[in-house]
Structures are given as structure tokens and as C-alpha cells.
Amino acid sequence: DMYVPFICGGPRVGVFQEMIQVLNAKHTIGGRTCETFGKTGSDGKNHWWMPGSYAEVIYQLLEKEENITLMCAAPVVGVKLKTSGNRNQVTGVRIMRNGDYQDIDAAVTIDATGNGLIADMAGCEYMFGSEAKSDYNEPVGIEVADGKVQPCTWMLISERIKRNAILPIDKLKGSSAVEDNLNRWVKADDKEDMIRRDAGIYLHWGRTVYCKDTREPLLLAQAQQEALERLQENLEIWHEAGYAVHLAPKLGVREVRRIKGEYVLTANDLIAGTMHDDVIAHAHYSFDVWGMKIPEEMKHIGPYGIPYRSILPTKTEGLLTAGRIISATRIAHSSLRVQPICSNIGMAAGTAAAMSALNQTGLRSIDIKQLQDRLASMGLFDGLKKK
């Protein structure tokens, strides 16, 4: 719903690899399977698909899972808690269903919201905004914490609707374009080649704006309105050129809460390529902190591991986190927040939750080696195997 149907980062393994394989086989923008895509789409080209294609493939994958029940239009509005000493025990959630509250009991709950709201409602400690470098002895970052999160971007897709219309890439202000199956971004100096390729449909990072507090719906609405106002000139240029513009249903938010876990992943871990003893997912992507300059020689890093402790909130039982809300500094978060890595973390969290529930074992007592073996059997560690 934020229109980021574009893959970056890795490794692309497990269910994420399965998804993009189907996307490449049946849903390419050009209508033909990309022959260089390989198993992971790591062919040096940009690949993207229509957001609806993502939804279609995900629903098809869900249909194969007999033990998954999907419920739509039923937001979580509360968390069921038991208190024991200095710990909270999460025993399920409360949802709003057709205007009434309904409680759902669960041996384990996973917060995969992307904003950490469930963990927040459970009373978990969380981090928000920029830390100072000295807070975690990181070599990159800012000297004094300012509490700012990364800016938000309103994504969009432009599509030709008039015969022979040409994307006015040289007139659009602050907007390059992503053409599917191309090894570079489309910019003004590429216009002649762009006309020759004649794609006719492009993905754009529309307008980027700051939101003071991405936890607050009113401030998000104001940021979205600002982004729309800043888009107006380009929207008119697109329309005059014979292009329709499909705006994402809502503003794209990069960063909200980061739930503090038993271990806080830092830039040092990523730079060193640390693989902790309790690693449950691999990750590989550069530091990508929008709104902050990171020296080029430090920006690009190698593979690293996500430890189980980073998805285990402190002082809380019965709850795991998944995706971009896990326990990490803002700098580390800027790398792990992308789709393949979030998917890998999600698979690990789901597997750990199933082990805990089936064995009636606390999340802090599960056999980590057994968890790792199960994840390995699902191919989750295949991305870093030696060729």
C-alpha cells in the first residue's frame, strides 16, 4: 500500500525468493519472463512489479498454508497481558471486528506491524529517532541525539495513456524513474535511449518530506498533504505529456519504533559482519539512512547476522518482533529495513513462535540450535553458502 514493489538488499531466500520467482515468471511489467533474473534477481538490473501483482502472489502463497487464517479489516486495538514480577506476559490481542471487540488468545504473538504498535501497547521499551554515536559507540552517525526519524516518501507509478506519449523526464523536478529490467535509473540525460526502449511505465520516488513524529496519525496526514502539494507541478507535467499517475494509497514511512530487545544490533555489528551464536537470519545491504550523510567508504558493508535476542523484547514474555521494528540502532536499522531482510526475520520469528507453542516452551527457553537447523532446512541460510 506504499508502492515499493522494488527489491534491494538480500539475501533473497525462503518465501521471499519463492515470491519473486513467481513475480518474474508471471507478472513482469513487459509481459515476458526476464531470462537473466536467475534465482534471486541479482543480475545487476532494477526489477519492479505492479503492487497488485505482489498482492496476488502473496494471496496465492497464503492459500497453500493450511494453518494460516487470514482476517481483513480487523485492526488490533489492544493487547492481552498478564503481569508477573517485572515482566509482562502477552497472551493475545484484542481486535475490532464489525464494530465489536474480539479477543484472540495466543501462546505467542508476533509484532510484524512495521510500526511496533503491538509491542508498545504491551509496555515494551522502544527506541525512536536518532541516537548519538556515543550511545552505542558507533563510528557513524551524529554527535548529539536529535530524535529525528528518516523522512517519508510518497511513491507513485507513471503510465502512458496517450499514443506515442513520451515521459517528460527532462522536465520533472527532482524525479528520476525506475524502468523495469534496466541496469540504471532513468534520468534526463538518458532521454534518447529511454524513447528508443519505449517502456511506457515507470516507478518513481515521488516527493520526500519530514514527519516530526511518525507515531502520530495527525502529523503523518500533514506530511502526506505537504508531499501532495509538492507533487502538484510534476503531476501537471505528467498529465500534459499524456501520462496517468498512480499515487500510492498512503505515504511511505521508513522508520517508527524500534523495540528494544535482549540485544541491540549496532553499526559495529554490521561493519564487522558479525554472526552471533544465536543468528536466525542473514542480511546484506548498505547503510541507507535518508537525511544523513554517511562516508562512502563506510556506507557499503558485507553480510551480517540477525541474532535471536534482537527479536526478543526485554522484560516481556509471549511476544516476538519481526521486520524493521527489531532491536537495532537507527544506523543498523537503515540497512535491515528492506524487504528481503524483513522477510527472512519474519520466517525466523514465525518458526520460533511455532516451536515455542508446540513444545509449550517459553521463548527464552527454545533450543536455538534446533531453530537454526529448521531455518537451514527451509533454505534461509542458503544465500551466503559458498558457490
Where in the sequence are the language-model features?
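Flavin (FAD/FMN)-binding glycine-rich loop and adjacent Rossmann-like elements that form
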Residues: 15, 30, 73, 85-92, ...
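Conserved N-terminal/central alpha/beta ligand/cofactor-binding core
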Residues: 1-80, 127, 150-156
